[in-house]
Amino acid sequence: MGEYTLQTACGAVKGIEKENSILFQGIRYAMAERFEYPKQVTHWDGVYDATKQELNCFQYDTFRKEENDSDNFYYEEFRKGRTFLYEENALTLNIVRPLQGEDCPVLVFIHGGGHETGTVGELPHGDTEEYAKRGVVYVSVGYRLNVFSLYRSRNYGLFDQMTAIRWVYDNIAAFGGNPERITIMGQSAGAMSVTDLLYTQALKGIVKGAIMLSGAGMVPKMARPYTEDESKEFWDKVQERAGAADEHAFKELPAQEIWEAWYQVSREHSDMHHLQPGIDGTIIPKLPQEIRKEGTDLDIPLIVGVTSQDFMPYLIFELAYGWAKRNVREGRQPVYGFFFDRALPGNRYKAYHAADLWYFFGNMDQCWRPFEKLDYDLSAQMIDYVANFVRSGDPNGGTLPKWEPVSKRNQGFRKFDGISEGYASPFECRRKLWHTFLRDKGPM
């Protein structure tokens, strides 16, 4: 490995030349003060050192340390053995570009974590070289989380993500990327963020495709964006718990006191004020179902999907399927659906929520599980599909089995299990019950 320096519109930046790619870590795309909106970085002095490990925004592990939680499944699965560095407003991104090539399509990934945790460097997706091998520039975005993002439904984290995408659009050509061929991808809360970003006109013409893993669409009563007035009572309680007389006093408290107050109050509430983006007038200008009804959300090709052991998989599938059916009904851009049902080897947790990340990013050698040839082959196929989609808006190509979008003729989702090549429409009985319950509210 050696160093590699290139010139961007912001200035020179130094990365690491690896076997199959060039890696740039921790590039700051924006600056922000606490509870203020991000300002895009347009210039830096000297040579930006992107050879060092990236910083991540404040979260649970910053203050309480996950290794002390003996029953934390996702720590054991995704983060054990890695050290993460934290900063309150670590608005940074990582870029993995091919060794050669210009005008490469660009994949921007937004990590999950319930809007309260998560990093760009987690084992399944951190700095994967698989897309660079296929001629795709891969970008992973860090953004503000929990109270530092969601305070009073102002969506600081979503604005971070939008700013990161605009920074990529303005600068990715210097990294060999094509700014006119950007696809955004997210998992879980990251997929919900992608959903929210499709509602804003600010990214129209910039984002050409979207991929949503286990989080496409929202239900009004379960994940509906709140207005600032609706969430006022919750945030007033958080400030009171912190001993702050008003918003200004709350803002001036040490970060850990702010986070602890939010964490304690949020665990006492069954509603979702503490974990959901809100109606901000810009990214989410109004209720999403109103935007969808007006047809002003971005009409671009989509990939949506679920795992068979997702959290409430029948509901998540129904939401994703409802999105696809709406596009078919209204003659919008195609939606390619998938159903991940590979039983991961190693323990009783099989196709769990986020298990598909190992396959979509190919970092299997960093996992403790005894993956088999079937798993590596399935992963290569899934990555090929995504690389094709990022390149053209269609996952098909080469010798890959045909992946049909949802249509009047094809009512199923492409099954990924390493065995079959068919389509699935699972959980039909439970989905019908949910569909009846949601009939007047509807997947959006």
Regions found by a protein language model. Give the residues of each.
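Alpha/beta-hydrolase active-site loop
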Residues: 154-173, 230-233
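Mobile gating loops/cap/lid regions near enzyme active sites that modulate substrate access
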Residues: 321, 325-444
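Short glycine-enriched nucleophile-adjacent loop
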Residues: 191-203
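Active-site loop->helix "elbow" adjoining a glycine-rich segment at hydrolase catalytic centers
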Residues: 112-113, 156, 160, 188-191
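Short beta-to-alpha linker loops that shape the active-site pocket of alpha/beta-hydrolase fold enzymes
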Residues: 143-146, 216, 341
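Substrate-access "cap/lid" subdomains that shape
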Residues: 204, 213-326
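Alpha/beta-hydrolase fold nucleophile elbow
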Residues: 175-188
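Non-catalytic accessory segments of hydrolases
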Residues: 1-155, 271, 371-382, 392-400, ...
